[in-house]
C-alpha cells in the first residue's frame, strides 16, 4: 500500500538530516497518514479512506459527499 493521501495526494518528500556538524544524510518526510471510516449518508454505507490529518480537516470543512465527488471526478476508485 503506497503512502499517498487519497484526498490531498500528498506523498513522501525527500530531504536531509542535518547533524550538529552540518553533515547531510538523506531521509524521507512521511505524510501523517491515517485510515478512517466515514459514513456516507447519501449512499447508506461506510467508506474507508487512507488520508492525512489535513485530508480529514478538508472533509470536516467541505463534507464527505463533496470530497467523494471530487475524488471520483479525478478517477479515484472509492
UniProtKB/Swiss-Prot annotation:
Residues covered by region (Disordered)? 1-25
One Pfam entry name: Ribosomal_L28
GO BP term, pick one? translation
The UniProt keywords, alphabetically, are:
Ribonucleoprotein, Ribosomal protein
GO MF term set: structural constituent of ribosome
Cellular component GO terms, alphabetically?
cytosolic large ribosomal subunit
InterPro entries in the record, alphabetically? Answer: Ribosomal_bL28 (IPR026569), Ribosomal_bL28/bL31-like_sf (IPR034704), Ribosomal_bL28_bact-type (IPR001383), Ribosomal_bL28_sf (IPR037147)
Homology family:
Belongs to the bacterial ribosomal protein bL28 family.
* Name assigned to this protein: Large ribosomal subunit protein bL28
Organism placement in taxonomy? Bacteria, Pseudomonadati, Pseudomonadota, Gammaproteobacteria, Vibrionales
Amino acid at each position: 500500500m503506497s503512502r499517498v493521501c487519497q484526498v490531498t495526494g500528498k506523498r513522501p518528500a525527500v530531504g536531509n538530516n542535518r547533524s550538529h556538524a552540518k553533515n547531510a544524510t538523506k531521509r524521507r518526510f512521511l505524510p501523517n497518514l491515517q485510515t478512517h471510516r466515514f459514513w456516507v449518508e447519501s449512499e447508506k454505507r461506510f467508506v474507508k479512506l487512507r488520508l492525512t490529518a489535513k485530508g480529514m480537516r478538508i472533509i470536516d470543512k467541505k463534507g464527505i459527499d463533496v470530497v467523494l465527488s471530487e475524488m471520483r471526478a479525478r478517477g479515484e476508485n472509492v
